[in-house]
UniProtKB/Swiss-Prot annotation:
It is found in: Cytoplasm. Disulfide bonds: none annotated. The gene is uvrC. The UvrABC repair system catalyzes the recognition and processing of DNA lesions. UvrC both incises the 5' and 3' sides of the lesion. The N-terminal half is responsible for the 3' incision and the C-terminal half is responsible for the 5' incision. The keyword DNA damage applies. SMART domains: GIYc. This is UvrABC system protein C. The lineage of its organism: Bacteria, Bacillati, Bacillota, Bacilli, Bacillales. It comes from Staphylococcus haemolyticus (strain JCSC1435). Residues 18-95 form the GIY-YIG domain. The keyword Nucleotidyltransferase does not apply.
Length: 596
């Protein structure tokens, strides 16, 4: 079956033309999982099935079972078609903006009686949008200010009587009174001017109201208007000035390094940089320019972004290609302050990539240092591959074990394994560990799989001795075995190693100790999760049902006393005894609850 689809793809590739167009990759269920475009379709499609790829492309190619292509007359047409196909199919491998970053906008709804709202959803034809705002607080504060000045309706549904907002002057009461549409139009114009940076009209309006209130000796109302004027001044001076004009514009910049591309977008509103967006893209088959054209098309067509008056992009890009997918004025500044903004966006993209690689390098450096330190302290070779085991059961019910693998100090989830205990009756941790280690390394030997440089067991000398006995006397293996002991707070406390399970001296703030902590937490999490899944499958309804000495009467009494399993977990042995449990049963219950 595998060779059938490969042969089919090979045959189809031989007839693909050397023309521009789009291609659709499909999986075994005939679902479109990737859409791309190319100047020469055959060359691009062949590249997927030859040579080495990064991890993401390798996963994609592994799922491809068929493909289709559509020939176009130009690269521009290919770009437009690609965006439409992505919108249509939403393929999971090439939605650049699938994290769906959304920003808050202020919206005046398109209704007979408009509302002023804050929203993260942009729907064309439903109203007038202003923004984006850097965060919800900023948008809400601005709306709150406008609500005090412009009495748009507040109710989602029109009530049959006047509400509180009418009585405090923040609504004109359209539920009862007729409101002239010209009044709404005038308010909308003034709000638009204000939110687009022209605050003179609204300030003059408020100053006139303040003077009028003062003349009428209504000093409390005059103070309110004075505070509103001050609030507007505070609101408009918070952002860094990036431009001397109030044109709404988005500024794009990008940088490419080590197979990654970062695209930065500056949102300039009222001459201010009010928000920044950064997107990291792994470069695959397309050039950096092609990736940019696809990105910017998706940015405005798929994501929650409104088109500004101008979009500024670097000079090296094809303006016509961008114009074909972005329906607004495209500017490529050559000099002056506007070019400096594009350069700044480019520089921010460069810095973001440098930071990304620096963090990766530091992480790799830390993990390598951790395993080197661990090897030195234990007196063994650097443990490149570590396999760790942990058991999980409740009083011997549904016993399971789990193994996690760490390579170069990092979790390798492909190496994780789960085991149901088959040969052990009752809660016997030592025998369970022996069984699992025997099964694991018998298979490793039979299948020629890589052996670990270090085995870690969650436990002490008894667990270590049992594992060593299986490895050395049954399987003939010489692999270092260490134990991890926990303190009374169930936290990693000590590393044990050697014939007498002696404590390995490790500083608690060392990278090696931090690595051991992560390994123990991860294997415990993996084992507990598997045990819970197993219990659910076997129909085990309550941890109380697993504890010897707790029947239906005691179970009812416990639930009546504590109200929930959560409260029982927080209870001490003394508390459990007060609920009528003998000390031994209380101890067993506490142990069972801590494992649940």
């Amino acid at each position: 079956m595998l060779s059938d689809y490969k042969e089919k793809i090979k045959n189809k590739l031989s007839v693909v033309p050397f023309e521009p167009g789009c291609y659709l990759m499909k999986d075994r269920n005939d679902q479109v999982i990737y859409v791309g475009k190319a100047k020469r379709l055959r060359n691009r499609l062949r590249s997927y099935f030859t040579g080495a790829h990064d991890a993401k492309t390798t996963r994609l190619v592994g799922e491809i079972r068929n493909f289709e292509f559509i020939v176009t007359s130009s690269e521009t047409e290919s770009l437009l078609l690609e965006l439409n196909l992505i919108k249509q199919y939403q393929p999971r491998y090439n939605i650049l903006l699938k994290d769906d970053k959304s920003y808050p906008f202020i919206k005046i709804t398109k209704e007979k009686h408009p509302k002023l709202i804050v929203t993260r959803t942009v729907k064309k034809g439903t109203g007038k949008y202003f923004g984006p705002y850097p965060n919800a607080y900023s948008a809400q504060e601005t709306k709150k200010l406008l609500d005090r000045i412009y009495p748009f309706r507040k109710c989602d549904k029109m009530p049959d009587k006047l509400c509180l907002y009418y009585h405090i002057g923040q609504c004109m009461g359209p539920c009862v009174y007729d409101v002239d549409q010209q009044v709404y139009a005038q308010m909308t114009r003034e709000i638009s001017d204000f939110l687009n940076g022209e605050d003179k009209t609204i300030l003059k309006n408020l100053e006139d109201r303040m003077m009028d209130a003062s003349e009428k000796l209504d000093f409390e109302r005059a103070k309110e208007y004075r505070d509103l004027i001050q609030h507007i001044h505070n609101l408009t001076k918070k952002q860094k000035i990036m431009s001397s004009d109030n044109t709404i514009r988005d500024v794009f910049g990008y940088n490419v390094s080590k197979g990654w591309m970062c695209i930065q977008v500056f949102f300039i509103r009222q001459g201010n940089l009010i928000q920044r967006d950064a997107t990291m893209i792994p470069l695959q088959q397309q050039s950096e320019e092609e990736e940019f054209y696809t990105f910017i098309g998706q940015f405005y067509s798929l994501n929650q972004h409104i088109l500004p008056k101008e979009v500024h992009v670097p000079k090296n890009l094809d303006k016509d290609m961008i114009q074909s997918v972005v329906d607004t004025k495209i500017v490529q500044p050559a000099r002056g302050a506007k070019k400096e903004m594009v350069d700044l966006a480019n520089h921010n993209a460069e810095v973001a990539l440098e930071n990304k690689f620096e963090l990766i390098a530091r992480d790799e450096s830390r993990t390598i240092k951790a395993i080197e330190e661990l090897g030195e302290r234990m007196g063994i070779q650097t443990p490149i591959r570590i396999e760790a085991f942990d058991n999980s059961n409740i009083q011997g019910v549904d016993p399971v074990s789990a193994m996690v693998t760490f390579v170069d100090g990092k979790a390798d989830k492909k190496g994780y394994r789960k085991y149901k205990i088959k040969t052990v009756d009752g809660p016997d941790d030592y025998k369970s560990m022996r069984e699992v280690v025997r099964r694991r390394y018998t298979r490793v030997l039979n299948e020629g799989l890589p052996l670990p440089d270090l085995i870690i067991v969650d436990g002490g000398k008894g667990h270590m001795s049992g594992v060593l006995d299986v490895l050395e006397n049954e399987l003939g293996l010489d692999i270092p075995v260490a134990g991890l002991r926990k303190n009374d707070k169930h936290q990693t406390s000590e590393l044990l190693y050697g014939p007498n399970a002696e404590v390995v001296p490790l500083k608690k703030n060392s990278q090696a100790f931090y690595l051991l902590h992560r390994i123990q937490d991860e294997v415990h999490r993996f084992a507990i999760t598997f045990h819970r899944q197993t219990r659910q499958k076997t129909g085990l309804q309550s941890v109380l049902d697993t504890v010897d000495g707790i029947g239906s009467k005691r179970k009812t009494s416990l639930l009546r006393t504590f109200g929930s399993i959560k409260k029982m977990k927080e209870a001490s042995v003394v508390d459990l005894k007060k609920a009528g449990l003998p000390e031994k049963v209380a101890l067993n219950l506490q142990q069972a609850l801590s494992n649940d």
